[in-house]
Amino acid sequence: MANGRMSMYSVASEGLGGPRAGQQPSQFSTTTLLNAIHNIYLSSQPFKLDAGTSLVVNTWLTASQTGPDGRTGGTIDAALGARAWEHARRRAEDGCIVLGSLHTSCPSLLTPFLSSLPLSLPSSLYKSLEAIQPFLRCSTPYNPSTPRQIALGVTLTLNLTGSLRGAAIALSQGGIDSTKGLLNIPVEAGYRAFDVFYYLLTSASTPAEREFLGLKSASSYALLAKSGTYEPPSYLPTADDAAAADDFRSALKDIGIKGSAHRNLISTLAGLLKLGDTLDYNLDEDVFDEICEDVSGLLGMDPETLATQCTTEDRATLVGGLYEALVDWVISKANEAISAQMVRIRDGTESIGGGGARTPTSNGEDDTVCITILDIPDPTLGKALAMRGVFDDTLGINSEMIADGVEVSAAGSTVVREMQAAIGEVGHELGIMTSATGRDRQHALEKREEVLEKIGHSADEDAFLKKLLFPITGQGIDLGRAGRLDLSSLLSSSRVWYHLSIHPTDDSPASLAALPSINSAWSAGTVSRQLRSWRLPEWANRRNKNLDFTADFDIDEFVQRYALLGCKDGREGIETWILERGWTNGEVVVGKERVWVRESAWWEAESMLDMKPLDSNLPGMGNVMAVNNLESGYSANGSGYFPTPMLDTTPNGSRDHLIAHQRNFSQGNLSQHTLAHNAAMRAPSVAPSGMRNVQAGDYGLGTKGDTFKGQVFYNNEGEFVGQMDPEIADGKHVEEKTMDKDRRIWVAIVWFWTFWIPSPLLSFVGRMKRPDVRMAWREKLTLVWFIVLINAAIVFWIVAFGKILCPNFDKAWNAKEVAYHTGENDFYVSFRGGVYDISKFWKIQHSDTAIETTKENMMPFAGLNMDDYFPPPLPLVCPGLGIAPTTTLQYNNTPEYVIGIHKSGILADDRTSALGATDWYSTKLLPKMREFYKGDLVWDKAFINSDGQNNDHMWVIYNGGVYDLTNYFKTLKVFQRVDSVNFLNADIVSAIESNPGEDVTDSWDEIVKTAANNATENASVQNSLNCIKNLFYVGIPDFRYSARCQTNNYIMLAMTIILCSVILVKFLAALQFGSKRRPAPQDKFVICQVPAYTEGEDSLRKALDSLTALQYDNKRKLICVICDGIIVGAGNDRPTPKIVLDILGVDPKVDPPALPFKSVGTGSEQLNYGKVYSGLYEFEGNVVPYLVVVKCGKESEQTKSKPGNRGKRDSQILLMSFLNRVHHRAPMSPLELEMFHQINNIIGVDPELYEYLMMVDADTCVREDSLNRLVSACANDAKIAGICGETGLQNDDKSWWTMIQVYEYFISHNLAKAFESLFGSVTCLPGCFTMYRLRTVDKGKPLIIADGVIRDYAVCDVDTLHKKNLLSLGEDRYLTTLMTKYFPSMKYKFIPDAYCQTAAPESWSVLLSQRRRWINSTIHNLFELMKLKEMCGFCCFSMRFVVFIDLFGTIILPATTIYLGYMIYLAASSTGQFPIISIIMLAAVYGLQALIFILKRQWQHIGWMIIYIMAFPIYSFALPIYSFWNQDNFSWGNTRIVIGEKGNKQLVAVDDEGFDPRSIPLQRWDDYAMANNLPGRRGGYMEKADMGYDDQYEMDEIRSVYSSVRQGSVLTGMNRNNTYMPPQSPAPFGHMVRASGAASPYHHDQAMANRQSMASLGTHDINRGQTPFQDFPSSRPSVSNLRGQANPSPGLGANRSQSALGLNRPHAAAQSTSSFDFQRGNMQGPDDSMIIEAIQGVLREVDLDTVTKKQVRALVEQRLQTGLVGERRTFMDRQIDNELANM
């Protein structure tokens, strides 16, 4: 017989065993039972009637609330399910749990009870129940969800380890009560038919579906219209058929009913509704025939069969039978879905709950047992079944007990008669067909079979109807038998457990909603009636007295099972053993052939059996469950991990109680309990061993990845196989989260911009099935749209905005500007107020005279005004003024080049040439010139005025034109105003003479207006104005200096000044002349964190070697490598953690335990496990301590390709959280306790001493002096919170893609970061090479380890696009942003002297991915920066605002590229004004950059700059565009899916078992160390006194409780005589509250002998070792001795402060003030001797010639780590004077 026994740490606790026999009440009465029921009802707890029966009280209201155990669905007894599970797997016997209802108003508990079982059930099971329930339930006045099935069972098949192997759903043979649920619904209000019909008719149906099915309103169907109730009860808070219909359709789809199957289903349902209309005897014949046609079309059968071969009774029978057959079909599809998922789970391709873990295999794979959870909603049937099992002594186990000689008191005759009456009512459901009800039932079934067979044969051959009625080809109607449960057979072959539900009142369910609380409804009479009806008092008395045996054995079987516990053979041996155990005859009864055991005694024996290996000499906890090949003693499932939240939730069986129970044998207490007996079991491992076999030589990490060379598929030995579906997962429940205001606003904006894109389009065309993915796409589109708008706005502003404000700005020239265009291809002239480009004309021979068009003749005219060279014939341009053809004007200025004068008409010099034509000017010249027109000639308005007023320049402005009549007035003067030349209107001439240089528009308009009344005068005025416009027009006033035209220029000028200033400041910031200063060696403690992921061995070795070789005190730096999961990188032949451990020289046989800690993840991913290794690493003579943390993941992750992987951010948080807890002395997780132990006791440095955290990537090499330079900069400026150095490339010439990055890396640091650093605002401290200060210097306030920083940085639900880009792509930049947010007054600096080299992407794809992360994280960090109150300052006058503007350039990179292209086009095509300013700025940018590396003599960067400029379009256009569009390109997890956001709520579908913080036990270090006798306690406890012991305190003896292995790597051959000194408290006065060594009650218990040192890394400072701050007051020299003792005896402390690794332990004198414990304060404060010694120490170290007394006082207080006030300060001042006087 297979033994299903697990460990003592399984589901069972003392609550499972139950009370012993003597602990039950002697007698139950109705009153005592009623009181007990009332009490448990008020507390929402179950009541244990006997070992196999539990009572609960439920209403629909309690079922809709979350109970004390965190579950919804009502009160249930999870312990009952746990007991049934334990019995099934341990006893290899089938079980049946009957869920009975004592009242028709009781809600169904099937689903919540299933969820409480200690099993991970497949998600498809819950989906199946969700799909089936609408077919079985309907609303009634007494129950909003009344089940109409006779019984519904869920059978779970288990192997003998208790693991699930299969599941199936089945109705009982009684089927469904379709009469009450469909055919004959009561006519009173409140009754409805089965819910599925209302779901069919809701708006959830598509229009096409409704049209195809011919659906109408519910009131139109006879079956549904009887009661007039069509809506669900309004008192239900979630009553909505449409929403329920959506869930129902989704559930159908999930179990495979989709496509044609779904169409067949809804067609059948619609056909049944219509068929119900034919049951009316008064139906019109035509309507009847039409309905039959419709129904036959929907069902696929002959309409004649319905119309002529079926009576009304037959059709009613058909409705009920066909509906039941349809439900059977749905259940069969559900079982197929469950079976398919279980196959996938067994194959390892899918997890049992969608979370990644598959069911582990075991030796009991072939032996299975079944547990059936049987839901019986009918109180009558439930009562008959239960009373038959309890009171009938002629059947079942009762008769077996009596036959075996067990004394059983007979049930009372009244009870027996009532039992028989109850059975008689429902005998046909129990297979009793001899009664009247049985015969009636048999007849009805035969009639149904006949009708169904007739209809089935008339159905079309391929019709769905035929498949429903004949599911097995070749067999007849088998409805009610195939796939059904036989209740009688099931109950007789199983151990039966009863879970009975009571309803507290007969009041209507609607009235419960108005009650003040969910437990207010109570009617003692109602409850009493239910108790008496089921005879529960008699039940309890009978079972507890005689029949409460839950286990029975054959005699030999009992001996065989408990032989290990001392049970001897034979009946006498058993009885003797029972007496030895102290059990009474009532607890264990030895019958004739069998042994009958009560639950408490059975469980006690099983627990002792589980504990038995603890007393044997088996090799460790791994064999506690050797029977099942499970290896851990920590878990409830043998997983090797802490218990999971699936346990008993009763007061005596709660999960917390279980953990408390286990605490007696686990963790620290287990170590104390067993260390004396078995050294091998000193520290139980919690390594994840349940899924794989860890062999020696694997570092305890298993063989995963060792032989697969980077492939992502693994074999079936617990390894990953195939691909997981990243999008679809089942079994989710929905959480509701409140969205903050910013998110709500953003969501509204997103929908405003993208509402026009329908979600179905994204779902089906874009293949975005998930709502959160679609929302991210919408957010991406909105952001891209904004970015496009911003870029377009920038380009528009630069290129077009000015043109819109001033359209012709670039089409206007003044005379001086025209004169600039004098080139052969830039030949401009002005003529008659216009500017012309005749570059293509002047070279042409355009003269028909002897004059040749040569360069010498033409070039002098370039840039000139040509008005005087082309005098027009006056009658031609001034018609109507009576001008003679020979009249000409006298020119005020004589043309310089006579050869260019072109007189035409009668005045032409050569009348035979083309110029001789009278109209040459108007028909030849002017049209030709228009071809070369460029714009207007403009004149400065002020110049026009001053020249007219002061120089008699006779020009005026009229209607926006400038008219120069100087030549006209010169002619009048020369000819003394004779009529022949005085042809203009006198009034107009007078206005000009009176207002030279002014605007005469008003005066001329007045003249025109006055002349309008006189035709002659009007003609004169109009002709004069026409003449002036044709002859004297010289241009327009210069509009380019107007406010409208200058606004944009001034804006651009201001921006240009800002940009030029930034460029100049960047340049100056990068200039650092002179030799590099060599800072003094620093002595601060630094942690060098190296996150490792998939790097190769070469990269890792270079990084670790470079850190080891740093020119820094080896004892004061710690290399902390955090391996992010057990992952095989591309090109590697084994996982990264193994590569790291191999490089560090860790012994492969080392197998530390896997310890739990909280990770950054969603749901259950927050629980992670890690292994800790420590030791010393040597490189080139440098020996440095290291700490390696390998995140190995939960047991369920071991089948995945990346167990333990949570990302780089999690690796950072792991260390930051640890240091935070160290700082606050807060409770730590087991992993953190182990880290503390390794650092404090093994490496030998109190973790609180570390002041800096340097983050270095695993592919980065740091230059030797870099760390010292970083620490020195921080030491010189206490305001620095973060600092970084310059990063260069180590693979600069590997490919074209690395080459284009060289110059960018150089300039981004030496310009961008240097500029930001000037203002202490470096916006991105790169994770590859950055150092953070842990605490402020003055007050010890945490910085990078502050609660706020860690809280915001450790966000787990990264479920929006913004969070993804912040936390998944730009961790380093966001961490800097958080630091800026929380500590705006601190500085974030860059120093170029600290240098490192990293590996740049060598391929385009990797570069693309990297820049996508960088660019998108920059964009999203901008939004975070904008939220900072200190960002802009007053009126934006803030340097951080300038830095923000600099970052803003990332968004407008495409616009920059477009504008550069536009400028190149302008310069090349000469189509516009040459962008001289832009060209100058570009030259300045790159010129200053070039000047930087030229001055720094970095000549190679000249070539790199050229390459970078060639690649500029890639950097500034291709990469940003790609990045912007791929902001939503993520691997979206499927455990938490945001399915909707509306208002201030966010709905999240959670497909995960969730994270229970209680799964990670937390404990303070001091409590942990005290409990496990570890050294290094920090305060409040007596530390190890300095006592000499002969034996040595070995390394193995100071392991933590979690450590069962030696340290990772050691250096042997060192001095073995170093005395161990426990780590002192970082609080300098912690020893004041401790007893001295002589008086301590722990003096002997905690005294520790000397122990072997692993390595000795230097000499011990004797003076420092005797500082008064050490924790050995009993051995501290007296004050009098201190004054004269320059060199204390070595025997007083030399070498005793070394750690397990031989590192000299630093004392308080070497501590930074930042390590002071500000929570505990100064305790009692320093005494006189301490102040004196501090003064002496300061005076020995300072320069007495330069130091002041104030400085000495400050140094003393710093050394004491406290401020002295009052008498203490007076004493210090006096003592300083005394010491100085004695020197």
UniProtKB/Swiss-Prot annotation:
Per its UniProt record, what InterPro entries does this chain match? Chitin_synth, Cyt_B5-like_heme/steroid-bd, Cyt_B5-like_heme/steroid_sf, DEK_C, Kinesin_motor_dom_sf, Myosin_head_motor_dom-like, Nucleotide-diphossugar_trans, P-loop_NTPase
Glycan-linked positions:
159, 637, 652, 664, 669, 1014, 1018, 1416, 1529, 1617, 1695
Task: Identify the stretch(es) annotated as Disordered.
Answer: 1659-1724
Q: Which PROSITE patterns match?
A: DEK_C
Catalytic activity reads:
[(1->4)-N-acetyl-beta-D-glucosaminyl](n) + UDP-N-acetyl-alpha-D-glucosamine = [(1->4)-N-acetyl-beta-D-glucosaminyl](n+1) + UDP + H(+)
Location in the cell: Cell membrane
Q: What class of enzyme is it?
A: transferase
Q: Which UniProt keywords apply?
A: Cell membrane, Glycoprotein, Glycosyltransferase, Membrane, Motor protein, Myosin, Transferase, Transmembrane, Transmembrane helix
Q: Which residues form the DEK-C domain?
A: 1725-1781
Q: How does the UniProt record describe the way this protein sits in the membrane?
A: Multi-pass membrane protein
EC number(s) given by UniProt: 2.4.1.16
> What's one Pfam family the UniProt record gives for this protein?
DEK_C
Q: Name one GO cellular component term.
A: myosin complex
Composition bias of kind Polar residues appears in 1664-1688
The disruption phenotype is: Reduces the content of chitin in conidia walls.
The Gene Ontology biological process annotation of the record reads:
chitin biosynthetic process; fungal-type cell wall organization
Residues spanning the membrane: 745-765, 781-801, 1051-1071, 1441-1461, 1474-1494, 1502-1522
For molecular function, the Gene Ontology terms on record are:
ATP binding; chitin synthase activity; cytoskeletal motor activity
Family the entry assigns: Belongs to the chitin synthase family. Class V subfamily.
What role is this protein assigned? Answer: Polymerizes chitin, a structural polymer of the cell wall and septum, by transferring the sugar moiety of UDP-GlcNAc to the non-reducing end of the growing chitin polymer. Responsible for about 29% of the chitin in conidial walls, is essential for conidial wall strength in media with high water potential and contributes to strength of hyphal tips.
Protein name, please? Chitin synthase A
